[in-house]
Amino acid sequence: MFKKVLRLVVLCSLFPLPFSLLPGCGPFWVDPYITVQESSLNWVVIHYYNMSRQPIRRIGVEIYGNGLVVVKKGTSELVSNDFAKRNKDESWDNIKTSRLQIDPANVTGIFQNLVNNGLLDREKTFKASKKESQTRFIAVKANINNNTYSDNVNMFEEDPDLAEHLLDVVREFEQPSR
């Protein structure tokens, strides 16, 4: 009798185990070419470095779904890393920051263009024709409609077509006309 009760208790305790794993699972076939919805929770951060010059010229562009655009330029590590530690470096204070407010509908258009060019398509990124090492570096991190991309790779080497679209966005805000 005791063995039957013990067996029943063990079976009852193991029964929910497979179901406990299901909530963390999600479909891996989610379409990366989504229609971007206007949301203040969407954002894209692009870091561009021109390594053909010394010191390295850096540009950071942060675009938020509410229309805020933050552009950082200079040779300081602070352009791409808010937590940089080398404050004794001679280029530490070589940073200029500007903030722009644009129409959120225009931001949604920028995000949609990047999505249409494969920003969220992980398969495209790693299967694209790769180029040799570049003297330019561009990386992107994004959250668009709760779809994220945050691999810190040089897009000029991984996906040159997307890299050119990212560079176009950087150039659009690098020298804004007011």
Question: Where is each model-derived feature located?
Answer:
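Residue-level detector of buried hydrophobic side-chain packing
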Residues: 63, 110, 138-140
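Short, flexible N-terminal segments of the mature chain
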Residues: 57-79
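A short-motif feature that recognizes glycine-rich, charge-decorated loops
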Residues: 72-122
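A mature extracytoplasmic/lumenal domain signature
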Residues: 65-67, 75, 114, 144, ...
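Well-ordered beta-strand positions in beta-sheet-rich domains
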Residues: 60, 97-99, 150-152
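Short, well-ordered, aromatic-rich surface patches in folded extracellular/luminal domains
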Residues: 27-53, 120-178
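Short, C-terminally biased terminal segments at protein or domain edges
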Residues: 1-26
